[in-house]
Amino acid sequence: MATGKSCSRWFAPLAALLMVVSLSGCFDKEGDQRKAFIDFLQNTVMRSGERLPTLTADQKKQFGPFVSDYAILYGYSQQVNQAMDSGLRPVVDSVNAIRVPQDYVTQSGPLREMNGSLGVLAQQLQNAKLQADAAHSALKQSDDLKPVFDQAFTKVVTTPADALQPLIPAAQTFTQQLVMVGDYIAQQGTQVSFVANGIQFPTSQQASEYNKLIAPLPAQHQAFNQAWTTAVTATQ
């Protein structure tokens, strides 16, 4: 009987020791995952000129629970990339295709369609920003991770959002004016003639109306180009 009691006394401390070792191992694992994620934020996310990558299976294992933190950054960056590539870059391409007065007419259809979709795009980006802000505010991060993640959030979310805010209205104003010019030329039908890189109208009234329509274009073009350049820089 004494032997049995002696064994019980030995097993109890051993079990406690194993539990401590096991728990310590868990804490060390989380620390390693956090350090790996911090290193990734500093050396990959904060690097300019590159889009955020999709995490590999190995990286997901390395980062553990912090994969969900990265999802906040990656999800918003995907929305911005899509907005730039599918919503705004086609506007730039269509504008660049206008070299002579006839091009106002040929580009008016695509520009009209783009102008109509810009309002929806602005709302989508606003909703994405609100979701990212809410998810960011809900995070409970350690003192070593929080400042690094906050810096990454500013780069990936806040700065692009601020840059896109004036770009879409500038694109809307500019494309709407371009469509108006194209529509006016089309309405004149065969009355208008194109000579070299210019345009001729049969009456001074028609020419005056055309000149009024194209007068705002240089300033609008400059505002759009400046906003576009700022947005491109902010999203790199």
Curated annotation (Swiss-Prot):
BP GO annotations: biological process involved in symbiotic interaction
Pfam family membership, one: DUF3053
InterPro entries given in the database record: DUF3053
Protein's recorded name: Uncharacterized protein YiaF
Native organism: Escherichia coli (strain K12)
